[in-house]
Amino acid sequence: MNFDVAVVGSGLAGLTVALHLADHRRVVVISKRTLPEGASDWAQGGIAAVLDSNDSHDEHVDDTLIAGAGLCDEAATRYIVENGRAAIEWLIGHGVPFTRDARAELGFHLTREGGHRHRRIIHAADATGHAVVTTLVDKVRAHPNITLLEDHFAIDLVTDAKLGLPGMRCHGLYVLDCKRGDVKTIIASQTVLATGGAGKVYLYTTNPDTATGDGIAMAWRAGCRVANMEFIQFHPTCLYHPFAKSFLISEAVRGEGGKLVLPDGTRFMPAHDERAELAPRDIVARAIDFEMKKRGLDCVYLDISHQSPAFIQEHFPTILARCLELGIDITRQPIPVVPAAHYTCGGVVTDQLGRTDIAGLYAVGETAYTGLHGANRLASNSLLECMVIGRGAAQDILGQPATAPTPTPIPAWDESRVTDADEEVVVSHNWDELRRMMWNYVGIVRTNKRLERAQHRIALLREEIAEYYANFRVSHDLLELRNLVEAASLIVDSALSRHESRGLHFSRDYPQTLPKALPTVMQPAHRRTSRKH
């Protein structure tokens, strides 16, 4: 299958790239599930941009740099912030139903979130991601130049190195048709990775099941640098229930007087921070983690039951309804909660146009490391980054020839030496073991001893998975596990190499912050030459 551009991933970043290209290029969008599926669709908050005359680019940049704890790239941050309004206007032009406010300058309601000094978050009620993605998916489905491959899983990139040629260029990729079970070869002049983050590497995550670090792992295997993978943002309060994966309990519950308590009803936050339940997100997450590990607890509890049922119904109707479905009446009893992996701040190293170290290969959205998020992401900057870098990547692609010559015929996928898997239990066991180990050893609070144990076990898991991959036909679950163990390895190696505590990385062995902030850049051992930006 031949296309001008292959876009891997169907969240906001991937859809933005595809729609900016489609009038001038033949585009294929590859999604491993049916659309819409991905973290963008789940995003509740909104999109940060300077949309009011009382606000300024300088202040938005400054807020971002403060949150990033010294590791933001200031030039990249300024570029993204300054292009924010144009990105929002593009969405409005496509008909995204943002919440309106007749009194606002632009006519839309702006809210304020932690770390922002002004109201600058444009939103669609409390389901912004869904509103944006649903609108764009309809446009993608209707465009004659876009081919949509749903239930297709990108396996690996086809590069010069894979073809045994000198140079560093990407020529497309191999893709598994998950329904038919066969592997397709997709040839493309440019390939864009927009597969999201790696939250599923942890036992508890707010991310959808698709967040298995696919793009990061593919780019790393192909020879791209990866940066700052130790910085994983954790949300402090995710509902703890076997039938409720990834359901967030909003920080507003604590804002309206909710108290964090142990199983016996004792509050613990005042002992950790004078701001108690209103301390910043990372401090609350660390405190909960400390109490759980110290006491061997599966969860702690968030109690809002002292407020009236009418108050709870008015302020938290969704949380009340979801908990009631699961047999938890939050007007009478506390909510079981755990911290959960929320956002991957690191990723594939790119420039401001999404270009990676390999010619013809781009990375956008949570897959990429542009330098915007540094050591900690500022709320609602992630969807902004998806759109601005996505549009920049599309413009860069449009400035190049539509069809690049393929140097040699790309061979079909070779299944001559593999058989059907007869031990699927190996995949499911390793999947469970990896995620539990990452949660216990590489979580919110880290120690060298735990990290070294994780590193040792990951090395063994990688060997087992590589052997399995070499001997059996690829499957959806096997490919996800292969990518997850790669992402886990990058997180652990990055964490071990940082001898300080900064932003989201907190080490008991190195509690101090060093005077100089330096990014952690991992370089593949097999890389031959580097393309400089």
From Swiss-Prot:
What protein name does the entry list? L-aspartate oxidase 1
Spell out the Pfam families in the cross-references.
FAD_binding_2, Succ_DH_flav_C
Q: What reaction(s) does this enzyme catalyze?
A: L-aspartate + O2 = iminosuccinate + H2O2
The main location class comes to cytoplasm
Quote the catalytic residue positions. R281 (proton donor/acceptor)
The UniProt entry's sequence similarity note says: Belongs to the FAD-dependent oxidoreductase 2 family. NadB subfamily.
Q: Which cofactor does it need?
A: FAD
Localization terms from the record: Cytoplasm
From the UniProt record, give the pathway where this protein acts: Cofactor biosynthesis; NAD(+) biosynthesis; iminoaspartate from L-aspartate (oxidase route): step 1/1
Question: Would you kindly state one Gene Ontology biological process term found in this protein's UniProt entry?
Answer: 'de novo' NAD biosynthetic process from L-aspartate
Example GO molecular function term?
A: L-aspartate oxidase activity
Q: What are the boundaries of the signal sequence?
A: none
Organism per entry: Ralstonia nicotianae (strain ATCC BAA-1114 / GMI1000) (Ralstonia solanacearum)
Q: Which Gene3D superfamilies match?
A: FAD/NAD(P)-binding domain, Fumarate reductase/succinate dehydrogenase flavoprotein-like, C-terminal domain, Succinate dehydrogenase/fumarate reductase flavoprotein, catalytic domain
Q: Does Plastid count among this protein's keywords?
A: no
Question: SUPFAM superfamilies per the record?
Answer: FAD/NAD(P)-binding domain, Succinate dehydrogenase/fumarate reductase flavoprotein C-terminal domain, Succinate dehydrogenase/fumarate reductase flavoprotein, catalytic domain
Coiled coil region boundaries:
none
Q: How is the cofactor bound?
A: Binds 1 FAD per subunit.
Q: Binding positions for FAD?
A: 10-13, 32, 39-46, 214, 366, 382-383
Function, please? Catalyzes the oxidation of L-aspartate to iminoaspartate, the first step in the de novo biosynthesis of NAD(+).
Listed A to Z, the keywords are: Cytoplasm, FAD, Flavoprotein, Nucleotide-binding, Oxidoreductase, Pyridine nucleotide biosynthesis
Q: Which residue positions does UniProt flag as site: Important in orienting the L-aspartate substrate?
A: E113
Which NCBIfam families does the record cross-reference, listed alphabetically?
nadB (TIGR00551), PRK09077.1 (NF006567)
The EC class name is oxidoreductase
Q: Which GO terms describe its cellular component?
A: cytoplasm
Its Enzyme Commission number?
1.4.3.16
